[in-house]
Amino acid sequence: MLNADALNQLRQLKTDIKQNKVVFPGTVKPTNGRFGFVALDEGRDVFLPPEEMQKVLPGDRVNVTEQEVEKGKTQGVVDELLESHLTTFVGRYLIKGKGHFVAPETPGINRWIFIPPKERMNAQPDDFIYCQIHRHPFKDGKGQAKVLRVIGKAGEPGIERAFTLANFDLADAWPDEVQKQADALGEESVSAHTDGREDRTAQPYVTIDSPGTQDMDDALMATPNATGWTLSIAIADPTAMIEPGSPAEEEAFNRATAIYFPGEPLPMLPDTISTRLCSLMPDVPRLALVCDLQVNNDGSLGDYSFHQATICSKGKLSYELVSHLIEGREDDDIKALPDAVANSLDQLHQAATALRKWRAEHALLSNDRPEFRLRLDENKRIRLIEPAVQNEAHRLVEECMVAANRCAADFLNQQGQGLFIQHPGLRDDRADNIRKLLEGYAPHLAEHDASTAEGFKALMKHTEQLEAEVPVKSILSRQLARAELGFEAAPHQGMGLAAYTTFTSPLRKFSDFYVHRLIKSALWDCPIKALNSQQLEALQNTQFRARQAANTLETWLKADYAKTLPEDPMEGTISRTMPSGFFVRLDCN
């Protein structure tokens, strides 16, 4: 038995070893295999073998040491768990022998996790379940999970949506205080806010949208003048009814955006607000933030102004009907339009044509990528995929929205504060690949400096008509950086504009809702709860997660739909390649 002196010496030896050990902080990066890496804060990656990956979860912050396993090769040993942010996840309930487990669907957790008897909530084999990490695996590589909720079984109607909501931590139901706030609102709430607003209820504003749209947040009208047109864009004004810092605003921030899942969207605001009291429905007075702007004959923008107004839409028009009117058709529905509305639509088309011509010459137009609508059956699975054809009415609305948003960006830039959409263009880390691509297939374009606004614009314009062995424009488009929100005005390279923001979808996007607050605060001293940098980052992360959720659900539904199709060969074009395979755009609908 060791005496006290020996024990003290042993403890001191352990302390000395620990103090002399070189540890590196970093973040765990999983792979599709059982091994992984730690991305060190100093910028390099350290390999983690399977036995070490068993002790950590994706995204864990850890301290690692390095040990040499053979000459010139090292691997990491997890020395300390600093933080673990992965607390909940989804998976499938499994039983093997006497053990009950969850097979996580979270990327990077490539193992089953044991569920103790008291934490199983009567889940059955193959149930989809929502779980919590009950015991982290750091100490011995044996983690445990706790079932928080049984989501359902594969094959149940709507299981794909329910699973996706749980997987991305998206709330479906409204918190009680939000629902209570929404239920307290009524038509009298609209009337209560009309004092001090311009009365534009007699003006021929109309909405142009899909027939099934209920959350209509923009209405348009236009009149000719000596140098072009006066374009008036009325945007729904939910900020008038929702107090800063109220439960509804906090929940809108938490959701960040409406998500248009096939068959059943997930709104940002309760239906009472988004599809009734603030939606610009026809023949009822509604509150609006209006942008009046001068469109010159050459499509350039002149003076603009913002107004708080009350409008009354003179019609809920479909894209198809407006497109028919533009084409000169004389359908019964077109003949039934009031003269003031028909004349306004004609002026809107002329103004939008000029706006688009100016953007084509001085900025960048986005390509009309093929879009499709998923039609679901009673079991909430795809029964039909049909093309969503973009017509002249879609382009009319797009040009009006872009013009109004450009005015909002310019106004906020003049105020010295705002919320802007910044797009730096091509990714810096792809510069060498882009240079080699251009030198190989378009050497005459390699001279353009894509890091500058003019160089990027020229490069993208020239590649539109480029004939080469490979689709250079398509490849370049996949090298673009992601657009980000920022408090300072900066170029939006993807659109070829010096500054850009959006305020035209306040019922659907919190960033637009917030821009309303900024404009009204600057012009009329309306109250605002300002965002800080941490909140801005959280907002962007939630927006990104929402896009991932929508893509995940659509991919799942499409994969199931593909199983029902005949096994006959179909023709298509390879649209993208990856190390794991490639994507094909089918020629058929």
Tell me the role of every PLM-derived stretch.
Residues 1-226, 322-326, 332, 373:
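OB-fold/S1-family RNA-binding modules
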